[in-house]
């Protein structure tokens, strides 16, 4: 019974739980890799003896965190659990395809670990640029295994996207029109379109790389009339929407959490928030070459990508100010999820500001491939996506599990994590401005101080992760009954009779009525 329940599940709650558990495990693997990176960089001199090994760990860290931690948790975990509940659907549109979406992920993860384990590993960076990833510079099977891993993860995401799009369009209960869709549902809906449009481009790029490596095509080899810059265009046409895929569901979760703990029935400027989500989704496809300001583009091309990149700051700013306005005039309940959400807004804004700086192509030429860029994207990921995940997790955990988290330990976890990530990544701005390049395992002595500070910060984050595991253990062993939250009338997912809602949510389809205030 248990075997068939978890292996052959067609239930959105069980599949969501599988995604959450898998994402937590992958997150621990990715965190372990990041600690290895920071240990190597804690002092000058070599620890791992070899830049190839170092770059293999950097590559695996990035791919694990993106494809096996953030996306499975945000889209697979929260998306599966909450979207059917929020729109009053009995389940997802294609329950068996939903199951396949999940079970493509563990084999993909194993292939990625295999790529690091065979030969000398794939030390290409997560971007897998040729000619470094070519058959010449990376002989052996490592890069091929990484390519197959990405194919499986991509197939999984495409299937999941089809499922979410169909579910949201066709399975809303009467009364939930598109202009009343909860913001988290909107964000995953837009994210699904981004995945559906960008992943096939990545699949094409890495398939061409695969044939370049194995069957003597020359898509990316100038000797046969190819161009390595083509790969960069194809990769970043996927890669830039991908970073919005990683953050948009987080935006949706933060909107729910802030409105909830501010005691508001909805976030400030709901319709503007929806348009902002959609605008970010569209603009995300029009700015990819800002990752390539140093490859020798025309000045007018650079001018366009600079301007277009800055325009993305407008809908993002609308969202940040709407979150601030939601807090205005409210009697806040200072529960752990609100702390994570406020931390998100503050730190994501800092990450966004460094993004506006990097959008200037003239400045980016200097800062490209320095730790300034590392600091920028870790502020929006390590403190954006991850804080959003913890905000959502601490907020909805009683709904998922039926038990309550310990409030004091939750606040301790937040405090440790907040100190840890800021201590890790803020000094990296200084390193970048001082010219320290990325993807090297060693550095001149002049950079020692801030690298040591950064590595101390990563140790604090590691301790915070262990505290989180303790919090989970404590919650399940103490079995505190989860109560219906006070201000829950605005969100359909809290309206069901028990926590967690029964295996099959409904006996019959609900109908929602909105009171005109």
UniProtKB/Swiss-Prot annotation:
GO terms for biological process: electron transport coupled proton transport; mitochondrial electron transport, cytochrome c to oxygen. Signal peptide: none annotated. Its cofactor is heme; Cu cation. There is a cross-link at residues 240-244 (1'-histidyl-3'-tyrosine (His-Tyr)). GO terms for cellular component: mitochondrial inner membrane; respiratory chain complex IV. It is an enzyme of class 7 (translocase). Heme a3 binds at residue 376. Binds 2 heme A groups non-covalently per subunit. Binds a copper B center. It is a multi-pass membrane protein. It catalyses: 4 Fe(II)-[cytochrome c] + O2 + 8 H(+)(in) = 4 Fe(III)-[cytochrome c] + 2 H2O + 4 H(+)(out). Its main location: mitochondrion. The chain crosses the membrane at residues 17-37, 63-83, 102-122, 145-165, 183-203, 234-254, 268-288, 305-325, 338-358, 380-400, 414-434, 456-476. O2 binds at residue 244. Keywords: Calcium, Copper, Electron transport, Heme, Iron, Magnesium, Membrane, Metal-binding, Mitochondrion, Mitochondrion inner membrane, Respiratory chain, Translocase, Transmembrane, Transmembrane helix, Transport. Mg(2+) binds at residues 368-369. Pfam families: COX1. One of its GO terms (molecular function) is metal ion binding. Its EC number is 7.1.1.9. Fe(II)-heme a binds at residues 61, 378. Pathway: Energy metabolism; oxidative phosphorylation. It is found in: Mitochondrion inner membrane. Component of the cytochrome c oxidase (complex IV, CIV), a multisubunit enzyme composed of a catalytic core of 3 subunits and several supernumerary subunits. The complex exists as a monomer or a dimer and forms supercomplexes (SCs) in the inner mitochondrial membrane with ubiquinol-cytochrome c oxidoreductase (cytochrome b-c1 complex, complex III, CIII). Belongs to the heme-copper respiratory oxidase family. Component of the cytochrome c oxidase, the last enzyme in the mitochondrial electron transport chain which drives oxidative phosphorylation. The respiratory chain contains 3 multisubunit complexes succinate dehydrogenase (complex II, CII), ubiquinol-cytochrome c oxidoreductase (cytochrome b-c1 complex, complex III, CIII) and cytochrome c oxidase (complex IV, CIV), that cooperate to transfer electrons derived from NADH and succinate to molecular oxygen, creating an electrochemical gradient over the inner membrane that drives transmembrane transport and the ATP synthase. This is Cytochrome c oxidase subunit 1. It comes from Patiria pectinifera. The lineage of its organism: Eukaryota, Metazoa, Echinodermata, Eleutherozoa, Asterozoa. The gene is COI.
């Amino acid at each position: 019974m248990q075997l068939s329940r978890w292996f052959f599940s067609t239930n959105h709650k069980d599949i969501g739980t599988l995604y959450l558990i898998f994402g937590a495990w992958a997150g621990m693997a990715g965190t372990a890799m990041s600690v290895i990176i920071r240990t190597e960089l804690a002092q000058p001199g070599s620890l791992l003896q070899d830049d190839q090994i170092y770059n293999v760990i950097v590559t695996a860290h990035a791919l694990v965190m993106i494809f096996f931690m953030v996306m499975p948790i945000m889209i697979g975990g929260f998306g599966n659990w909450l979207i059917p509940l929020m729109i009053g659907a009995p389940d997802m549109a294609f329950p068996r395809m939903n199951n396949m979406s999940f079970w493509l992920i563990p084999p993909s993860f194993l292939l990625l670990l295999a790529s690091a384990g065979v030969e000398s590993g794939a030390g290409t960076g997560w971007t897998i640029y040729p000619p470094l990833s070519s058959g010449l510079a990376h002989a052996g099977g490592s890069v091929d295994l990484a390519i197959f891993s990405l194919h499986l993860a991509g197939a999984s995401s495409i299937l999941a996207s089809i499922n979410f799009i169909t579910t949201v369009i066709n399975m809303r209960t009467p009364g939930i029109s598109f202009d009343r869709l909860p913001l988290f549902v909107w964000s995953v809906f837009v994210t699904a379109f981004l995945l559906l449009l960008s992943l096939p481009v990545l699949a094409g790029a890495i398939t061409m790389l695969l044939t370049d490596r194995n069957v003597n095509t020359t898509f990316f080899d100038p000797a046969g009339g190819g161009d390595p810059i083509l790969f960069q265009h194809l990769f970043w046409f996927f890669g830039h929407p991908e970073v919005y895929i990683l953050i948009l569901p987080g935006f949706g979760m933060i909107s729910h959490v802030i409105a909830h703990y501010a005691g508001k029935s909805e976030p400030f400027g709901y319709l503007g928030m929806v348009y902002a989500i959609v605008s970010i989704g569209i603009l995300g496809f029009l700015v990819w070459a800002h990752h390539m300001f140093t490859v020798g583009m025309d000045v007018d091309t650079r001018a366009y990508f600079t301007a277009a990149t800055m325009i993305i700051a407008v809908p993002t700013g609308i969202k940040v100010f709407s979150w601030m306005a939601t807090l205005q005039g409210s009697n806040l309940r200072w529960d752990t999820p609100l702390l994570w959400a406020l931390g998100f807004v503050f730190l994501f804004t800092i990450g966004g500001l460094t993004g506006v700086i990097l959008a200037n192509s003239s400045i980016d030429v200097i800062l490209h491939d320095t730790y300034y860029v590392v600091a920028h994207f870790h502020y929006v990921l390590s403190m954006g996506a991850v804080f959003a995940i913890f905000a959502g997790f601490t907020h909805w955990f009683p709904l998922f599990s039926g038990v309550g988290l310990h409030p004091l330990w939750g606040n301790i976890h937040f405090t440790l994590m907040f100190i840890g990530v800021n201590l890790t990544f803020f000094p990296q701005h200084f390193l970048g401005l001082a010219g320290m390049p990325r993807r090297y395992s060693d550095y001149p002595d002049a950079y020692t101080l801030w690298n040591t500070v950064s590595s101390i910060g990563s140790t604090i984050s590691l301790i915070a992760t262990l505290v989180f595991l303790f919090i989970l253990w404590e919650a399940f062993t103490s079995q505190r009954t989860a109560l219906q939250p006070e201000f829950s009338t605005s969100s359909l997912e809290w309206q069901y009779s028990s926590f967690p809602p029964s295996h099959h949510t409904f006996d019959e389809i609900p109908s929602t009525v909105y009171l005109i205030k």
